[in-house]
Amino acid sequence: MAKQTFEMTFEGRPLVVEVGQVAKQANGAVVVRYGDTTVLSVAVMSKKMATANFFPLQVNYEEKMYAAGKFPGGFSKREGRPSTDATLTARLIDRPIRPMFAEGFRNEVQVINTVLSYDENASAPMAAMFGSSLALSISDIPFNGPIAGVQVAYAAEDFIINPSASDKEVSHLDLIVAGTKEAINMVEAGAQELSEDIMLQALLKGHEAIQELVDFQNYIVAAVGKEKAEVELFQVDADLKAEIEAVYYDQLAKAVQVEEKLAREAATKAVKEEVLASYQERFAEDEDKETILRDVVEILEQMEHAEVRRLITEDKIRPDGRRVDEIRPLDAEIDFLPNVHGSGLFTRGQTQALSVLTLAPMSDTQLVDGLDPEYKKRFLHHYNFPQYSVGETGRYGAPGRREIGHGALGERALAQVLPSVEEFPYAIRLVAEVLESNGSSSQASICAGTLALMAGGVPIKAPVAGIAMGLISDGTNYTVLTDIQGLEDHFGDMDFKVAGTRLGITALQMDIKISGITPAILEEALAQAKVARFEILDVIESAIAEPRSELAPTAPKIDSIQIPVDKIKVVIGKGGETIDKIIAETGVTIDIDEEGLVQIFSSDQDAIDRAKTIISDLVREAKVGEVYTVPVVRIEKFGAFVHLFNKTDALVHISELAWKHTEHVEDVVKVGDMVTVKIIKIDEKGRVDASIKTLLPKPEKNEDGENGEEHRHCCCSHHKPDHHNESVEAPKKSDESETKE
């Protein structure tokens, strides 16, 4: 195929698609140019059905550092494992694409997106989502798209589609919505406590833009699309299914209605094992034994799926006996752990999450280096899902895509209520440990995170709670479920997570298994979630009504001091020598920003005070008129040097020692004497003159109107020589040995 180019203008930027020039051996490939962002999207499919009992779809999103004119970090100086942002973007693309393949499709499919050129004002993730859908749509892969996605911002009471970098800075909303021309099928959002009405408007506004992008894709597919390949779909033997249903359906249906999770799992497992054992014995010598047994396992899964959905839609009975809008039993507890900076334990039915708070100096913020300009990330929310939480053994290691995604959702939900750096100058890390799970563990981690933040004394604006909504739909009728458990998530059509405060929504995430949902379903789910959210907030606030006024004793305390910018180098010292010495002596952590704000962290207040005094002395400057009680550190013929602070000394000229004539400096002061002096002069070089006599009573004048002694031996200050320049004179800044005397 020769290169073909298609172009439209979308939201004020050119959107150009090139087909037929690159990656021609793949099933489908497109180059998408949006503004100055360029993404190559490629789709490939295996020739045969995979043996897995699921659809093996893999979506990758690769950020090449050259796309932004940047050099990769690290020793190898090349791209390594995907960044967290790249992993989250891959999930964003996967989620709206996955429902668009036929039931029973088991061929392996890979969709690879490579960012080749990056423009921060033209969304690369949205270009990649568009390119992924289009690469699948023009290929011979049987994909029931196209889909598209857009980013929506909200500022000045207006919605902005695919906002620029400057638009994002002032936006109260960061929403990504994807779908087909007919309906929405994926949502991901962070919001600053926006109402359900505004969120719904944003979703509908985004869907309008999606329709325009889908039309453009359909136009391209009509021009260059390949005929779809004939692939084998996984199907069970119809006669075998009818036979098993006739004998075992009622038995399995009864097991499904056992309310407690572990007991229900044991009951359904017993039925399935009985059926499987029967057919293993029956077909022990059959050459198609493996295929038959595989079908038996799939049929039993389909039977359980059908009965759970029938109970909810027809009988309005949920597996655990709840009403469709009923939340499982709730419990909230703080201070579960000693010696940490804050902890919260949240339990909802058989789902339980422990959240642990750690506070640290701002120097511990995470440095994020991707295609965007490098920045520091202050708040981290990490989510861990060990296999024991569901009573199973399994792999332990680095977090997978699911854990990264759930952690990011909690981070978005809670970030909206955190105090500013000016109000609370700490780096903040929350770790959610899922201890038990029967669905909605990500939302439990948000609730536990709220408890940990408030218990740890972080002055959040308001508590945040999260709830997961579900959907069972037969295409005509539907039922929206509040607080879905694992079985309802597994066999249901939607997982719609809503987090927020009493004022509004802070995060949304929606995944579905059908092609899309209507605005009416969205509206009902949001309204039902609001009621549930308030009920959960009541329980959270019964455990702790507001953030504690003080940090935990183990948490680092903080004090700050503002220093002149030109004094930063004084505090740091050559090669960091001075600041390292302060840290070693006091045990504190010190952060200094480019504007001279010095922040001192330690769990020991005395250590903070010592460090603050040292720094204050380092940058302190004497002022005319100030009075000090200080030691004499040096004697010269022309006067005495006194140590004011740090490395700053002052000269008390011999004429400023006393009102009467002084023949020898030692007649008045000696090294080591503590004297009270007043600063009388600071010259243009910063040299300091002080006086003792100005603080003493002045002698009465004689009959001639003069002070007798002073008149006979006049040594007036305005005529006295500049002894600061004499070779025997110690400099204004004494060495450290003198300072310590």
UniProtKB/Swiss-Prot annotation:
Domain S1 motif residues, every copy: 625-693
Catalytic activity of the protein: RNA(n+1) + phosphate = RNA(n) + a ribonucleoside 5'-diphosphate
Free-text function comment from the UniProt entry: Involved in mRNA degradation. Catalyzes the phosphorolysis of single-stranded polyribonucleotides processively in the 3'- to 5'-direction.
UniProt main location, coarse: cytoplasm
Gene name, Swiss-Prot/TrEMBL: pnp
Presence of the UniProt keyword RNA-binding in the record: yes
Enzyme Commission code: 2.7.7.8
Keywords of the record: Cytoplasm, Magnesium, Metal-binding, Nucleotidyltransferase, RNA-binding, Transferase
First-tier enzyme category under EC: transferase
Cofactor(s) the protein requires to work: Mg(2+)
Positions contributing to Mg(2+) binding: D489, D495
Name of the protein this chain belongs to: Polyribonucleotide nucleotidyltransferase
One Pfam short name: RNase_PH
GO biological process: mRNA catabolic process; RNA processing
Single GO term (MF): 3'-5'-RNA exonuclease activity
Domain KH: 556-615
Compositional bias ranges of the Basic and acidic residues kind: 698-713, 723-741
Naturally occurring in which organism (per UniProt): Streptococcus thermophilus (strain ATCC BAA-250 / LMG 18311)
